[in-house]
Design a protein with these regions (language model features):
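Transmembrane alpha-helical hairpins and terminal membrane-anchor modules
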Residues: 39-88
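Short, isolated positions within intrinsically disordered regulatory regions of eukaryotic proteins
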Residues: 64, 76-77, 107-108, 133-136
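Short, amphipathic alpha-helical segments
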Residues: 31-59, 118, 123-142
Length: 152
């Protein structure tokens, strides 16, 4: 007999359901997926380089380094951090029902599925995720590849 978590894993692997993760809650000190090297060291290096350039060369060079560093942080590094937090959290919560239950109760996780008839189902902390998984029909279809879900 398969458990609800096993069925959820199958649905997620087949892209028939989506797992939502509250990135900000999970990317904070104290959570098991937080990595301080990802979050503290890069901005620290940017600030040190900016201050050093300001003191040793000129204010404008320090400001340029700070602006370029902030742009790099926002456009390049932050999306990688978000993806890493999502991947680590998904692996952690899908590993055991105990972990899934705990993080579900904390409001970190959500579930979403689009049914073949076009209706959508979502579950958050207030709903029972096990009942949500059990209530999904067995013949849940995926969207054709390349087609985005759109509100009607």
């Amino acid at each position: 007999m398969t458990t609800e978590l096993d069925r959820l894993r199958e649905l997620l692997d087949a892209d028939k359901a989506k797992l939502g993760i509250h990135i900000r809650k999970m990317n904070s000190p104290g959570t098991p997926v937080y990595r301080s090297l990802e979050n503290v060291v890069p901005p620290g290096l940017i600030l040190v380089a900016s201050f050093a350039a300001t003191m040793l060369v000129h204010f404008y060079l320090g400001a340029a380094i700070l602006a370029a560093g902030c742009a790099w942080w926002l456009m390049r590094h932050l999306p990688q951090v978000k993806d890493g937090v999502f991947d680590r959290t998904a692996a952690m919560v899908l590993a055991s029902e105990k972990q899934f239950d705990f993080w579900w109760s904390q409001g970190v996780l959500s579930l979403y599925a689009k049914l073949p008839d076009g209706s959508e189902r979502a579950a958050t902390r207030r709903q029972d995720w096990r009942a949500w998984v059990r209530d999904l029909p067995d013949g849940l279809e995926t969207l054709p590849s390349g087609q985005m879900m759109q509100e009607q």
